[in-house]
Structures are given as structure tokens and as C-alpha cells.
Amino acid sequence: MPQNTHVEMADIEAARIAQEKKEPAADFAALRKNAEEVSRCLAWNPSVHASRFFSARWKAMAATLRPVLEKVGRAKRKQPEPDDLRWLRENLHLLWAQLWNTRNAFKQLPRLPHVLTPRGTTIPRAAAVAEAYLYAAEFDFSHASFTAYIGAFQESTTLKFRELWALIPAMELALLEQITARSRNVFDETQPSQSIGICIRSLIEINQLHWKEVLEPQIAFDQILRQDPSGTYPRMDFESRNLYREKLVLTAERSDSTEMEVAGQALELARQAQQTPSDDPRMALRESHVGFYLVGAGSNELRERIGFHPSLAHKIRSLLRRHPDEFYLPGIEILTFGLMSLIVLLLTSTVTSPALILLSMLVLLLPCSQSAVQLMNYLTTALLRPEVLPKFDFSKDIPEDCTTLVAVPALLLNEKQVRRLVENLEVRFLGNHNRNLHFALLTDLPDSPVPSREDDPLVDLCGNLIKELNEKYSGKQMGTFLMLHRHRIYNPREKV
């Protein structure tokens, strides 16, 4: 159970660890058992959704750690130098950077579930789990032990999507608190070593770890989405999968269902669509994809199932997406008229003649309309933010069912230019080796006052160069080269 609710508690724990004979923290069975016990001890507090827990803890820690780091930076190096002081001196820049990075990370944390600890305090569950893991591992972080601990914890208590990502800054804060507590007597050579190096090494490991690969397998509802009947979701890249997960989380937060239930309903809808006969196979494939109900046209069907309660902002965005023309064009007209009217009212009086007012509005029409267009563009991008387009992950290979042709359009002007076009095509090929990736020149001849010849020398040259490329790389089982030429028909009326 996490005990370090204050830096002072971390100080006590540091002294205890320094006095005890430590054993290697590689006993994953003990870690799993501890995770199960912590899971049973933490009681969810549904009445608390946000708190100043992280900011208060950071301020208390920073107030103590900053003077220590400043003193270490000013102190002259001595020989021999205590291990703790050496660790602080050699990693001074890292600790300063980590101090401010952690504060910035807490500013970006969303509302997190809170739990009631056995000591009667209410803290974010992510903080409780992070501290419990580090204490169980004796602050010696490793990828394997962290994965084992979180996996065991989630066997009885499922962490939400945002909680998993909050574990990273929560662990960094706990480690900084330990460094703060253990460094208070770092200049006292009579004091025993406090093993500051373990905490700093763990901080370095956390910063160097590829967290996308570590946390994605821990997302509980992600395993449901990977059962996508269309087989599309597992083949997508991380950013696209994360887009789906973010949409699912936002939907769950505004509904009567949990993240797991929303994922289950999306999967059920996709399976029902797969079993329903359809005359359009392409549409049937789309509707059998879980993304169709998370980010696509089927999202309303999913929201009806889970009891979605849209916010006012969501209603406005949905209305704008359904009626873009009715929003954009009339908006420009209204803003143009409003700007013109405002300027005319400020520059005229009750004795100004109507003809002069009309002339002023005509003069202001062009600049006001330009300003209105810019303002509408800003409002549109502010209300409807761009999103990642879902895409497949072809970083390792392009499967046969996604065979791709890269077509380069070009005009054939002269022999030198044709040879350069083919050379550039070969360069593209050499930078993208794949048996299912093919390259083509989409060629045409420039306009001419006379009909084009059937045996144009530039066309023949380009075709021969493409043929030579195919022969050159024929034995390497990679993509092929093509030339797709458009034979133009002479138009007597236009004389081209």
C-alpha cells in the first residue's frame, strides 16, 4: 500500500531502506501478490473526480529539492566523493529538466478516478498504483517488473485509459520525492549512503522507455477492439489506433457505460453488420469495422446503445459537420455585413446622407469580406479541429491485399529530362524495397499544333529505359516498373 503521501514519509522510508539489507527486486511473484493486495485495499471514491493532489505534492517536493540541486551545482568536487553526491552532480541537468517536465505533465493530466486509501486519504488511483509499485520494487524500475505489476493489478481492477498514461508522471514524482528525501544529508560524510543512484537510474529508464509499446498491451478495452471482424484495427498504425481509443474514452465519459462496455458494444455492432447480407461488399466491409461506430457514420448508432449524453459543444460540432455549407457561407455574409455596419456606425452620424452611407458600404465591402473569410476560417478550425486520418501500418511490410502503385505524372519534353525522370523513379524504388510496391511514370506529350506521331522518339526512349529497369531488378523479387502513356488525339477546332 502506498505510504509516501508527503515528502517526510519518503524521508522515513529512505532511512529504513538504507539500514536494511536489500535483496534484488526481481521477485515478480511477490510483486504480483503486492499488486493484488493493493487492488483490494483501494476503494473507489465516485464523488471525487479532480483534486490538487499532484500540484501540491510537486510544490512540496520542489521547495526542498531545488536548494539541494543549487548547492550541488555550486559545491566544489572533492576526492574521494560520496556516491550519492556523485550521482547528483553527474545528473544535475537531468534532475532540473525532470523537475520542470513533471510539473508540465501534471498540468496536462485530465480528470482521474480517485480512491480512498486505508489511511483515509483520497488520492488519484494512478498515484496510488505508481507509488505502490515503486515501493514494492524498492524504487528499482524495470520494464518487466512494471508490466508484471500492472498486469496483476488489472486482474481485479481495470485501470482507465487515461490512468495508464498518468502512471508515468506519477512515478517520476515519487522518484523525485525519494531523491529529495535521500539527499538531505548528502553533504554529511558521516551519514551512510542512501542509494540515490537507484532512483536516478530508474528516472533515466523511465525517460528512455518506449511507452507506446509498454502501455498499449495494458489497455484493457484494446484487446476487445483487436477482435475487429474486418481485421482492420490490428493492422493500423499506433496513431490511428490511439485516435479510436481517444474517441472511445470521450464517448464513455459522456455515457452511462464504461470503456469496456463501449468497446464491447462497438464490437457487437460490427459483428452484426458482418452477418447481415449486403449488395455492396465495400460498404459491408466498412460497417463490419469497429471504427465505423467509433469515428465514422455509425457513431450515432453506438451512442444510442450506450446512453450517450452529448454536451453543448458536442451538439454544436455535430450540427456544423452535418451542415457545413449552411454554416460557412452564411457566416461569411453575416460577418461581412456586421463589420461593414459597425464601421459605418462609428464613422457616420445622424446627419450623414444615405448616399454617402451607401457609398461607404460599397467601399468597405471588399476589405470587410476578406476579414470575414479569415475570421470564419479561424472559427472553423477552432470549433472543428483536424484529426488524424486512420491508416494502415506499412512500416514493416505491404501485404498482398494492399498492393500499391506509385504513379509519377510527367510531360516528356526532351531526352535529358526523360532520362532524369527514369533515374528519379529508380531512386524512389531503391528507397522503398517491397515486392508489393510498384512504380510507374504517367506520361504525356506537351501541346502541339500538329498531330502527335505514333512512334514518338521520346515515348520509345522512356519505354526502353523502363524496360531496362525491369530487367536490372528482375531477380530481386521486388516491385516492377511501368510506363503509362496517354496517346493524345488532335483537336482540329482548338488546333492542339
Where are these regions (language model features)?
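Alpha-helical bilayer-embedded segments of polytopic membrane proteins, i.e.
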Residues: P169-Q178, R317-N377
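ATP-dependent phospho-/nucleotidyl transfer catalytic cores
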Residues: E20-G120, A148, W165, G479-K495
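Carboxylate/His-rich catalytic cores and anion/metal-binding grooves
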Residues: S353-L379, L383-E387, L445-V450, P457-L469
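Basic/hydrophobic alpha-helical interface regions
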Residues: P2-N4, D11, C41-W44, V48, ...
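Juxtamembrane/interface segments at transmembrane-helix termini
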Residues: F187, L346-S349, S371-D393, R419
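Active-site activation/catalytic loop segments of kinase-like enzymes and analogous catalytic loops
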Residues: T122-L164, M171-N185
